[in-house]
């Protein structure tokens, strides 16, 4: 069974088609990169997947069901779509404790996820003083609170320096080795080539290619394959 499925997904905002006939599946226990030019429909597709936007037609499934039908969704799926969704006046630890309390997750889990993302030393600092990279780590910690089976990450490397990007690569590989399924969108093609197992390339809201990283790039690079498959796009 695929961990995540998009079936003929379409989404219109007024007369604008953000996504059209997107069909793709994501295998369990792998890191899959969702790639496409600006405006290709990546973020809208993820929002439909997470029940934050209603599809015009088609459907999405996580672990075989629509997001709204998941039982205890925080233990099934964690998501990072925006690293700015924290209370700036609270510390990193306090923000996570609020999230944990709302989901009836033990406080002890907060310290566990802070350690996982290497944010223990900044845990008692107010979130408004966090760098963008630190906010990304805090967002990852929040997504991991429920120890979910599936992670959805939209541009998780934003704001990370080269050391942070290398850390993120190893971190995601470790999570996948533990059996978690990870769907990640990113513009950092060179980094994605060294991180993901599979790739979905979309353009104009449609799937242009899907397969293993080796199948997609052949003897070339991910950037070369991406540019070939999205030729003619307006950015």
Task: Tell what function each PLM region has.
Residues 58-73:
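Conserved ABC transporter NBD signature motif
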Residues 97, 101, 107-122:
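Conserved ABC ATPase "signature" region
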Residues 151-155:
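Catalytic Walker B motif of ABC-type/P-loop ATPase nucleotide-binding domains
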Residues 192-194:
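A short, surface-exposed alpha-helical micro-motif characterized by mixed small hydrophobic
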Residues 210-211:
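ABC ATPase "signature
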């Amino acid at each position: 069974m695929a961990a995540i499925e998009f079936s003929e997904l379409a989404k219109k905002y007024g007369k604008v088609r953000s996504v059209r006939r997107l069909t793709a599946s994501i295998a369990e226990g792998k890191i899959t990169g969702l790639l496409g030019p600006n405006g290709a429909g990546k973020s809208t597709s993820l929002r439909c997947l997470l029940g934050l936007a209603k599809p015009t037609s088609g459907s999405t499934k996580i672990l075989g069901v629509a997001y709204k039908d998941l039982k205890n969704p925080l233990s099934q799926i964690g998501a990072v779509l925006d690293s700015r969704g924290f209370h700036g006046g609270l510390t990193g630890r306090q923000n996570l404790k609020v999230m944990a309390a709302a989901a009836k997750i033990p406080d002890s889990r907060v310290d566990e996820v802070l350690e996982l993302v290497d944010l223990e030393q900044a845990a008692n600092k107010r979130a408004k003083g966090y760098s963008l990279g630190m906010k990304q780590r805090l967002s990852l910690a929040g997504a991991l609170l429920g120890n979910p089976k599936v992670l959805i990450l939209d541009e998780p490397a934003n704001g990370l320096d080269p050391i942070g990007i290398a850390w993120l690569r190893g971190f995601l590989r470790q999570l996948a080795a533990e059996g978690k399924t990870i769907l990640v969108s990113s513009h950092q093609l060179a980094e994605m080539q060294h991180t993901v197992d599979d790739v979905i390339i979309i353009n104009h809201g449609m799937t242009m290619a899907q397969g293993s990283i080796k199948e997609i790039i052949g003897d070339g690079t991910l950037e070369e394959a991406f540019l070939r498959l999205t030729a003619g796009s307006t950015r």
